[in-house]
């Protein structure tokens, strides 16, 4: 199974890149994590936010691999603790499809992305900066993988 992280935004601070790459490089060859960055729409004083979201959504959905399960990262989504995420990861593996996780930009996800999703995952009831979500998702997925394989990374 392959994991795709499709995220709005292309110019991340160095500390985000460093943190994300640290976890990306830890993933096993049989479950690689791929980052696909979607350019954020230009936001200005008179920007049409609805149109920007729509365009970002179109680009995100176009980047999803054919037949992939789509999971959105969204505050109202399901809240999985680490053991539940590990169970979810096992279910995804058994499903036999790759998984695309969608992270929206500053205004969130386009309605089309939410409609296309089979699942929605909430990391927290807190609003997080979307660049930080990349690092948190990568670490959470790596930790969940470590539980499913009895790797010593996760400790109770």
From Swiss-Prot:
Name the Pfam families on file: SPOUT_MTase
Could you list the residue ranges forming a coiled coil in this record?
Answer: none
Which catalysed reactions does the entry list for this protein?
Answer: pseudouridine(1915) in 23S rRNA + S-adenosyl-L-methionine = N(3)-methylpseudouridine(1915) in 23S rRNA + S-adenosyl-L-homocysteine + H(+)
Its GO CC terms are:
cytoplasm
**Keyword annotations from UniProtKB, A to Z:** Cytoplasm, Methyltransferase, rRNA processing, S-adenosyl-L-methionine, Transferase
Q: Where in the cell is it found?
A: Cytoplasm
Binding positions for S-adenosyl-L-methionine per the UniProt entry: 73, 104, 123-128
Q: What is its EC number?
A: 2.1.1.177
Give the InterPro entries listed for this entry: Alpha/beta_knot_MTases, RlmH-like, tRNA_m1G_MTases_N
Tell me the GO molecular function terms: rRNA (pseudouridine-N3-)-methyltransferase activity
Q: What does this protein do?
A: Specifically methylates the pseudouridine at position 1915 (m3Psi1915) in 23S rRNA.
Record text on subunit structure and interactions: Homodimer.
Q: Name the family the entry cites.
A: Belongs to the RNA methyltransferase RlmH family.
| Name used for this protein in its record | Ribosomal RNA large subunit methyltransferase H
> Which species is listed as the source?
Proteus mirabilis (strain HI4320)
Q: Which gene encodes it?
A: rlmH
């Amino acid at each position: 199974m392959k994991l795709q992280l499709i995220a709005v935004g292309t110019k991340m601070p160095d500390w985000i890149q460093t943190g994300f790459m640290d976890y990306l490089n830890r993933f096993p060859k049989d479950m690689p994590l791929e980052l696909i960055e979607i350019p954020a729409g230009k936001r200005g004083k008179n920007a049409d936010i609805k149109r920007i979201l729509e365009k970002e959504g179109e680009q995100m959905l176009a980047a999803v691999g054919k037949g992939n399960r789509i999971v959105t990262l969204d505050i109202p989504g399901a809240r999985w603790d680490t053991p539940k995420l590990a169970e979810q990861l096992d279910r995804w593996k058994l499903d036999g499809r790759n998984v695309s996780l969608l992270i929206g930009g500053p205004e969130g996800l386009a309605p089309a992305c939410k409609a296309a999703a089979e699942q929605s995952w909430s990391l927290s009831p807190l609003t997080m900066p979307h660049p930080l979500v990349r690092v948190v998702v990568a670490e959470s997925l790596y930790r969940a993988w470590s539980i499913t394989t009895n790797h010593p990374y996760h400790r109770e």
